[in-house]
């Protein structure tokens, strides 16, 4: 009993327990850093410091650069390497329809009523329930769309039925509304993978916090760099390249070195749809996420394609 009591005292000292829940900690940190920025004073956090790792003389991976560029609540001259815990600004958020109801409940629990103004774009999908439009889906999905529409998200189905339901899957829509390689995307689906920026699949609570605060907290993952050489044959589809990557990785290492890491592709000439084919496959390889660095000309072409698709969405209401 004494041993258990001593263990309990350790847990009581944890911040989220002292605060009465994780939401209080998240909002407390956000308010504190925001107040210091407005008042132009140095941040002296009342909270326990996050784990910060900096290796002198070591360069930065693409994901480390993205995380440092979007980091919140750290000093300007501090640069972090993989393994560091960091709060980051989230640019794009996706909520999918099977977990969306839980996300809406989380938002209600934290008394959030409108999407964070720092989020560039957010989408509530209807693609998972669209194929099985049973009585439960017919009851829950319109209610979910009404809530998310009012909250400030683009919704796959219009609560007022003034436009046709969108059949595009969540990943494709998020790809189209992501505009640059420096974006951080959070989506309520394990296959949240983007052709631009770096995207992470997340639980309903993390999605809710990203929508409400425009931020997420996570460790900076380690990376594995993938380099392509030569020219793809005319008879080949890009999916052949994807399968060849897996085969070569297993032949070279004998084990799945992608698991839990970021896969970085520095080819630069992959258009959005090809890049998505690759990044979507990385979910099957149990990678944490994937990054496809684009050359400027390639990024412009991808954005033109995305612009046409978004225009179709606008034209349909």
Segments predicted by a language model, with ranges:
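Single conserved hydrophobic/aromatic residue that forms the stacking wall/gate
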Residues: 1-7, 11
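Long, structured ligand/cofactor-binding scaffold of large enzymes
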Residues: 81-219
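Phosphate/diphosphate-binding glycine-rich loops and adjacent basic-rich segments that engage nucleotide
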Residues: 9-12, 16-17, 303-317
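Short glycine/threonine-rich loop-to-helix capping motif typified by GTGT followed
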Residues: 135-137, 271-279, 304-309
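Flexible, glycine/charged-enriched surface loops at secondary-structure junctions
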Residues: 43, 75-83, 116-120, 154-162, ...
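N-terminal amphipathic, basic-rich helices that act as targeting or association modules
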Residues: 46-120, 264-266, 270-276, 289
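Structural signal for hydrophobic packing residues in well-ordered secondary-structure cores
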Residues: 30, 35, 67-74, 110-115, ...
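Mobile "lid/hinge" segments at catalytic clefts and subdomain interfaces of large enzymes
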Residues: 12-20, 24-44, 182, 186-299
């Amino acid at each position: 009993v004494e041993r258990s009591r001593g263990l309990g005292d350790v847990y009581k000292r944890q911040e989220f327990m002292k605060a009465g829940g994780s939401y209080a900690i998240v909002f407390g940190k956000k308010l504190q850093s925001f107040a210091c920025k407005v008042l132009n004073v140095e941040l002296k956090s009342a909270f326990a410091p996050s784990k910060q790792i900096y290796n002198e003389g070591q360069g930065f991976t693409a994901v480390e650069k993205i995380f440092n560029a979007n980091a919140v609540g750290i000093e300007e001259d501090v640069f972090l390497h993989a393994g560091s815990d960091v709060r980051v600004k989230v640019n794009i958020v996706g909520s999918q329809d099977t977990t969306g109801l839980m996300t809406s409940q989380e938002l209600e629990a934290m008394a959030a009523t409108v999407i964070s103004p720092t989020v560039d774009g957010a989408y509530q999908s209807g693609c998972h329930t669209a194929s099985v439009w049973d009585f439960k889906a017919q009851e829950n999905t319109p209610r979910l769309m009404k809530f998310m529409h009012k909250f400030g998200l683009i919704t796959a189905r219009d609560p007022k039925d003034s436009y046709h339901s969108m059949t595009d899957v969540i990943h494709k829509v998020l790809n189209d509304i992501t505009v640059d390689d420096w974006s951080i995307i959070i989506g309520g689906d394990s296959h949240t993978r983007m052709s631009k920026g770096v995207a992470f699949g997340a639980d309903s609570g993390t999605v809710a916090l990203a929508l409400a605060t425009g931020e997420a907290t996570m460790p900076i993952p380690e990376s594995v760099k993938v380099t392509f050489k030569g020219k793809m044959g005319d008879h080949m589809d890009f999916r052949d390249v994807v399968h060849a990557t897996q085969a070569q990785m297993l032949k070279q290492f004998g084990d799945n070195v992608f698991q839990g890491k970021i896969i970085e592709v520095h080819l630069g000439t992959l258009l959005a749809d090809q890049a998505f084919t690759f990044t979507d496959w990385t979910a099957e390889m149990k990678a944490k996420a994937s990054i496809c660095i684009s050359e400027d000309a390639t990024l412009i072409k991808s954005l033109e394609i995305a612009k046409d698709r978004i225009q179709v969405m606008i034209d349909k209401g």
